[in-house]
Amino acid sequence: MKHIRTRFAPSPTGYLHIGGVRTALFSWLFARQNNGAFILRIEDTDVARSTQASVDAILEGLRWLQIDWNEGPYYQSQRMDRYREVIEQLVKSDDAYRCYCSKERLIELRNTQLKNKQKPRYDGFCRDKAPRQSNEPFVIRFRNPVEGAVVFDDLIRGTISIDNRELDDLIIARSDGGPTYNLTVVVDDWDMKITHVIRGDDHINNTPRQINILHALGAELPHYGHVPMILGPDGKRLSKRHGAVSVLQYRDEGYLPEALMNYLIRLGWAHGDQEIFSREEMVQLFDISAVSRSPAAFNPEKLLWLNQHYLKTVSPTIIAKAFATQLEKAGTDLRNGPSLEQVIALQAERTKTLKEMAQRSFYFYQEVRSYDEKAARKHLLATIVEPLQRVRERLASLPSWEKEAIHEVIVETAQLHQLKLGQLAQPIRVALTGDTVSPPIDATLYLIGRDSALKRLDHAIRFIHQGMG
């Protein structure tokens, strides 16, 4: 069997979005499960719009998702001489020709065709004319066959046939000599010995044109697979409002790479009713021919559900660095407090993203500067001062700071003052966190630590006294 070689070829004119990442994932999985090579190519011939920042974001996004590549990144901007060489080869073999048609003529041609309800296309005016000796500007067009059809077996859509009469003579070199997309991608796939081109279905109209150029070059054809687009929850093309944002924005919003990878593989592909896939299972089970031909709908709630699953199941040690980044972005000082791993283990059941977890965990690391007004009004009352003082004294005298002993102090104090457990736990919670929501109060006290907990109880008691005064 031929050595499988797939590629991902993004254009660095913007961010790496969800659709592009899913295409990269499918291509990467196909290579990995066939012990093949995954090639990364940067299509940066659009000099005006390509930026180094976009290149950096693409590489960073792929690395974050651990979509690794065997070769590259190759840059089209560094291969211009090769493209010019192939263009000259096509002209010499009479598979391409100079076109001197002016912009005005082409506009007039298009308007006439539209007026006559015809499909706009180049009419071949210069196709059989001899090259001029003047210095007039010209483009170079590929001489597309006028007979027969282009037939190929799409890995996802099955057999596709396009009549060559539907295709006009596309431009392969602009008037400044610069190669066009359909030329560069053909040369790259040929030179890099790509065996399987897996890409978005927005490229499907380019495929028959590229196949004809490959035929003219005497090149072996790769297999093609066109992945349907991703729609928003409203059934329309995915917008920024519904998730069409940079993959790095998901990282910055506190999603885990495992969750996003798992979510993307299920966008348009299924393996029975299985929802959770490890990376090993993805490589083992993914089947490109089983990808749906219909567009997939992006579901933000499903992604959140998966993210929480991985927050609960991935080792806290693996998540700790990303969690620290979220805490620091929220302005939390991490010099004091419990280990990040302890907080992650405690909060994973209660939060869906690392960003949310960080927002709800600041009180483990720094003093509470203020209380939620509604929470203080309801729970920090004069009647609770004595029970709080009792809890404070008992906690201070514990021989060791253990969660079970802390729990006993709260239960016994509640019984002594004839309070329900919640009637005592909530004021303690407000004193410790400034609000009414936290993990179990004994676990919260344990992680905050004895010294800080006693300070916060003292502060709450003073706050109540000031309100009484």
Curated annotation (Swiss-Prot):
Coiled coil: none annotated. Keywords: Aminoacyl-tRNA synthetase, ATP-binding, Cytoplasm, Ligase, Metal-binding, Nucleotide-binding, Protein biosynthesis, Zinc. Zn(2+) binds at residues 99, 101, 126, 128. InterPro entries: aa-tRNA-synth_I_cd-bd, aa-tRNA-synth_I_codon-bd_sub2, aa-tRNA-synth_I_CS, aa_tRNA-synth_I_cd-bd_sf, Glu-tRNA-ligase_bac/mito, Glu/Gln-tRNA-synth, Glu/Gln-tRNA-synth_Ib_cat-dom, GluQ/Sye. SUPFAM superfamilies: An anticodon-binding domain of class I aminoacyl-tRNA synthetases, Nucleotidylyl transferase. CDD domains: GluRS_core. It catalyses: tRNA(Glu) + L-glutamate + ATP = L-glutamyl-tRNA(Glu) + AMP + diphosphate. Its cofactor is Zn(2+). One of its GO terms (cellular component) is cytosol. Binds 1 zinc ion per subunit. It is found in: Cytoplasm. Catalyzes the attachment of glutamate to tRNA(Glu) in a two-step reaction: glutamate is first activated by ATP to form Glu-AMP and then transferred to the acceptor end of tRNA(Glu). Monomer. This is Glutamate--tRNA ligase 1. It comes from Coxiella burnetii (strain CbuK_Q154). The gene is gltX1.
